[in-house]
């Protein structure tokens, strides 16, 4: 919970204090995860705080929207990172009896989702002045993890 919930809460809380003190509007952005709506086996310690984080994002929208402080999140899946490294990709692909390439393209669009795609989603939410409480999914299409 410390890394995947409280770090977000601490940053968001301090950011809101600054925005209120300076009487400015702004946007809080939360790095959520597919795990928040579609937990994977043996990923409880990662997924539980991410589920709480999704609700925290929405709570900030409710609590501070009237002050012009927006709160949005990105819900991404299968992005190469320090957590989803080559060893984990190989292990998860082997468990599913697919190649690593097939594992990374295992979505409706059949395309690997890259860090750049996630960065673009964060940028879009940051500049969308009329959007708050939104969770933008960036996963190439994973119906099991869909918010709808």
Stretch-by-stretch model annotation:
Residues 33:
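Residue(s) in the substrate-gating loop at a strand-loop-helix junction
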Residues 66, 79-107, 148:
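A glycine/serine/threonine-rich, flexible loop-to-helix segment
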Residues 1-10, 29, 53, 104, ...:
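Catalytic Tyr-X3-Lys loop
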Residues 12, 49, 57:
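Active-site helix of classical SDR
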């Amino acid at each position: 919970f410390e890394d995947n919930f409280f770090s977000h809460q601490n940053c968001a809380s301090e950011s809101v204090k600054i925005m209120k003190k300076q009487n400015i509007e702004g946007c809080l952005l939360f790095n959520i995860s597919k795990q928040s709506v579609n937990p994977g086996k043996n990923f409880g310690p990662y997924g539980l705080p991410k589920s709480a984080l999704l609700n925290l994002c929405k709570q900030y929208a409710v609590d501070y929207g009237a002050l012009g402080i927006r709160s949005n999140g990105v819900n991404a899946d299968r992005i190469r990172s320090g957590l989803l490294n080559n060893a984990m990709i190989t292990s998860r692909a082997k468990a599913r009896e697919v190649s690593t390439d097939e594992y990374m393209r295992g979505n409706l669009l059949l395309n690997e989702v890259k860090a750049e795609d996630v960065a673009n989603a964060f940028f879009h939410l940051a500049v969308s002045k009329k959007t708050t409480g939104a969770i933008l999914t960036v996963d190439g299409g994973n119906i099991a993890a869909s918010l709808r």
